[in-house]
Amino acid sequence: MISDYEGPTPTKKFDQDILFDYSEGEKEFTFELLDSYISSVEEHLPELLNSFEAKDLKGAVLHSHDIKGSSSYIGCEAVRYVSGKIEAYCKNDELEKAESFYPELKKEVEEVFKILSDFKKNWDKNHGEGGSDDGGDDNESEPTENNNNDGSSVNNNDSSSGGGGKDIENKNTDENTGKNLNERSKSPVPLQTTLKPVTIETPKTASDKIATETPTSLANNTNSSSNNNSKNENGLNSKQPQTSSNSPTKIQTK
């Protein structure tokens, strides 16, 4: 509404100081944000003038609104106020009244652009290009070291290995021999292929004992039987059992 812009234009160009918040390491105003604002105003300011010349009320509303919105986003109070006044008069079908504030808007924009340009130049001068506090590359980091279990340190930023700047060498050596325990032996250890013969003893059964005994006892039994038969022939009273030739011979084992 027009009543919102009846007062004088604010003398303060921004509603806050343009600065960087170092405590949190984050920028309140990034260069990208400032460049985006400048590009937006540089685009819409000439288009607003063209709309005035073409008596394009709708176009004037559009471009003045865009300038006001981007100025409000970064707290550019003076430009926001003048562009908002132009938008309000355009919406009220007062194109000529709105056009009368264009020179003031252009003046405020030029002053703001100068402030932003000086701000960036001073930043580059004091802190170096790229926005880092030490003037160096933000992506460049100090070499870091890791400690191994044996107390030795490892440089993780050694670029000699070509592996992304992290050549980690673990020096684990034997205290007595000084040999690196991580190195594999170049001569492979042969596998043990010669096996010692193993003798397995199994218990013998009764039949095994019979099979392995010498026939001496059997021979003695045979001789004893012959003697008994001869005694029977001589008239002795002892009798020998008659066995069939087909019946198996029984052998008593004790």
From Swiss-Prot:
Record gene name: rdeA
Domain of life according to the entry: Eukaryota
Domain HPt, chain residue ranges per copy: 26-123
Biased amino acid composition, Basic and acidic residues: 166-186
Keyword terms: Cytoplasm, Phosphoprotein
Modified residues (Phosphohistidine): H65
Gene3D superfamilies noted in UniProt: HPT domain (1.20.120.160)
Lineage: Eukaryota, Amoebozoa, Evosea, Eumycetozoa, Dictyostelia
Chief localisation class: cytoplasm
Compositional bias per record (Polar residues), positions renumbered to this chain: 239-254
Post-translational modification: The phosphorelay mechanism involves the sequential transfer of a phosphate group from 'Asp-212' of pde2 to His-65 of rdeA. In vitro, dephosphorylated by dokA.
A Pfam family annotated for this UniProt entry: Hpt
GO biological process: phosphorelay signal transduction system; positive regulation of chemotaxis to cAMP by DIF-2; sorocarp development; sorocarp morphogenesis; sporulation resulting in formation of a cellular spore
GO cellular component: cytoplasm; cytosol; nucleus
Phenotype of gene-disrupted mutants: Final morphogenesis aberrant, rapid development (body formation accelerated), premature spore maturation and elevated levels of cAMP. PkaR and rdeA double mutants are rapidly developing and sporogenous. acaA and rdeA double mutant forms only a very small number of spores and no cAMP synthesis.
Protein name: Phosphorelay intermediate protein rdeA
Biased composition (Acidic residues): 131-143
Location of region: Disordered: 124-254
